[in-house]
Amino acid sequence: MPAVWPPRTVIRKSSGLRTLESALYRAGLGPVAGVDEVGRGACAGPLVVAACILGPNRLESLSALDDSKKLNESERERLFPLIRRYAVAFHVVFIPSVEVDRRGVHVANIEGMRRAVAGLAVRPGYVLSDGFRVPGLPMPSLPVVGGDAAAACIAAASVLAKVSRDRLMVAMDQEHPGYGFADHKGYSTRAHSAALNDLGPSTQHRFSFINVRRLVVDGEPGQGGELECGKLAVDVPVDMPVDRVLREGQLSR
């Protein structure tokens, strides 16, 4: 029986992004998958969750990996194809805003993490998640506080999720003009709030968020028309048209 790991751990950044993964591989618990999400705090657009396995060896091509929120856009875009090329396996899940409303952000996030791990072409022996415990996984897992800045596989998942969501929000800006999705990516900013006040919510907004819900008149959304019901978690490629996001496809390897 492998050693029982603590229920939650903090890894110092100075110890290196591969320290925890290397320890797990040495203990015979690999392959090690990292899982992370982006879009929890946005009031529009999907919640995006990615899982990624990098393998036991350090790759110089991915030496710039860091928490995707600390990398600038050009650095994330440069790393995105490299991660897809060198990863042993990865899988990205998009959870539509209507399901975030229906299930709640936390429940949708945990379900998305399970789906992302289940979608990996290589079954991991261990899963590292960024901060959140993920119940229901068929393999041992460990939530790591600040994991996207402490474990390379989580950092890679963070970049995959962030770039995938950002690209989708840019495309969504074309289908729902006026909100500025390409700029703020669905997060609450002064410009986004002003657009919401002028246009009302679209079908891509999260009606469970108070700043959106207060603008709904008689339960009807604004510019976007009727709310569309989607599946709980739909896996889509980053270049798929937004009108197909809720229905089909996948981004994985």
Swiss-Prot record:
Its cofactor is Mn(2+); Mg(2+). The lineage of its organism: Bacteria, Bacillati, Actinomycetota, Actinomycetes, Mycobacteriales. A divalent metal cation binds at residues 36-37, 130. One of its GO terms (molecular function) is manganese ion binding. The gene is rnhB. It catalyses: Endonucleolytic cleavage to 5'-phosphomonoester. It is an enzyme of class 3 (hydrolase). GO terms for biological process: DNA replication, removal of RNA primer; mismatch repair. It comes from the Bacteria. This is Ribonuclease HII. Signal peptide: none annotated. Belongs to the RNase HII family. Manganese or magnesium. Binds 1 divalent metal ion per monomer in the absence of substrate. May bind a second metal ion after substrate binding. It comes from Mycolicibacterium gilvum (strain PYR-GCK). Residues 30-221 form the RNase H type-2 domain. Its EC number is 3.1.26.4. HAMAP family: RNase_HII_B.
